[in-house]
């Protein structure tokens, strides 16, 4: 189509005024193929073999371990401020969905709090993980993957949120 603007969100539907933030619809991380879980999640399976038979145990943390480096998410979570650390660790170890794409719509004062929390945490993560050893799909974009998981937790804890599709086109 010639006019991209007709597909862009340029104003918020008044029905959404009761919400403080809009985040993308969640995606479910459970349901990985057994062979992939064995190949990429073997360390987790040694600790808890029931993961193979219980989709509820295929948590955000398990998925992250399989795709972005074993224990990286838990290591990063331990660097959070005290007020968020335990709740975030609970979230990643007990949920099997997250809101992807690091996309949100919120008022400036909420975004300022979000970015302050996020970037102070990521700065601590940089001191632990650095950049030199982050290579390949698994870890090259580690900080983006961490931010993506944290967004789901943070906006649900600190705002009255609404989940929406990140795209809706009627072509």
Please state what every model-predicted region is.
Residues 1-171:
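ER/Golgi luminal nucleotide-sugar-dependent glycosyltransferases, focusing on the catalytic module
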